[in-house]
A protein has these predicted regions:
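C-terminal motif of bacterial Sec signal peptides marking the signal peptidase cleavage site
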Residues: 13-16
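Positively charged n-region of N-terminal signal peptides that target proteins for export
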Residues: 1-4
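Residues within mature, well-folded domains
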Residues: 18-97
Length: 97
């Protein structure tokens, strides 16, 4: 009986995974347009960013999620968006594996 309970509690840990960041729907990345898409549209599409920062005086938002699995490899996707002084997308970069 003790062996069974040990297996029941340890098995999920063996199959476990870890996640860092905040998942986001990457389906709308194709709709981002430089000098057109606004911060409000980005929030509507992706939610609140995982990180906010500043790059050369411009607002920069990062959407990032990394998922590690005990069995398998790392799943990762990231979207970095730089906004101009009118709160429109100046540039962006999306990567996933």
């Amino acid at each position: 009986m003790h062996y069974f309970l040990l297996v029941v509690f340890l098995f999920p840990l063996w199959l476990g995974c870890a996640t860092v960041g905040k998942d986001f729907d990457s389906g709308k990345v194709k709709d981002i347009q430089n000098n057109v898409t606004t911060q409000l549209e980005i929030i509507d599409w992706f939610g609140v960013p995982f990180k906010e920062g500043n790059e050369n005086g411009y607002t920069m938002w990062t959407y990032q999620v990394d998922k590690w699995k005990v069995i398998g490899e790392l799943e990762s996707k990231g979207l970095v968006i730089l906004f101009d002084d009118k709160n429109k997308v100046k540039a962006y970069r999306y990567e996933s594996n």
